[in-house]
Amino acid sequence: MPRKGPVPRREILPDPVYNSRLAARFINRLMYDGKKGVAEKLFYKSLETLGEKTGEEPLKAFERAVESVKPHLEVKARRVGGATYQVPMDVRPDRQVSLAIRWLINYARSRGEKGMSAKLSAELIDAFNSRGGAVKKKEDTHRMAEANKAFAHYRW
């Protein structure tokens, strides 16, 4: 922990095509080994496909897909007197976006389609229609929080 106070958060510049910070964050998370050009190509190609399949503007469809994956509750482990409880907590807005992006990319990578852009567009289309692995993960997270509602008074 630094003595001079909290470290300021770095400002992420919006992406060049859609001028969106959300898209820039997604591209940065998608990137492997600093290969941003490759990540951008994948992202823009899958957004193009998403726009064609949904019949909506690609960025709006992408934002709706991310919105449908954002969790509002999560559980955090809390030790109380030798026992560990799963305590339901509200998720901060920036963490909601981070988790949604992470889940979308992870579930896209584990899909069976050929090529990452096809996998990513398929996962985004599923998220847009409120189904798929990332949406299931969100629902599981909410279910866990609901099941452990009895421990909500342990919040800190």
Curated annotation (Swiss-Prot):
A Gene Ontology cellular-component term: small ribosomal subunit
SUPFAM superfamilies cross-referenced by the UniProt entry: Ribosomal protein S7
InterPro entries: Ribosomal_uS7, Ribosomal_uS7_bac/org-type, Ribosomal_uS7_CS, Ribosomal_uS7_dom, Ribosomal_uS7_dom_sf
Alphabetical UniProt keywords: Ribonucleoprotein, Ribosomal protein, RNA-binding, rRNA-binding, tRNA-binding
Gene Ontology MF: a single term: rRNA binding
Annotated GO biological process: translation
Cysteines joined through disulfide linkages: none
Pfam families reported for this sequence: Ribosomal_S7
Source species, domain of life: Bacteria
Membership in a protein family: Belongs to the universal ribosomal protein uS7 family.
Main function: One of the primary rRNA binding proteins, it binds directly to 16S rRNA where it nucleates assembly of the head domain of the 30S subunit. Is located at the subunit interface close to the decoding center, probably blocks exit of the E-site tRNA.
Subunit structure: Part of the 30S ribosomal subunit. Contacts proteins S9 and S11.
Record-given protein name: Small ribosomal subunit protein uS7
Organism whose genome encodes this protein: Nitratidesulfovibrio vulgaris (strain DSM 19637 / Miyazaki F) (Desulfovibrio vulgaris)
The gene coding this protein: rpsG
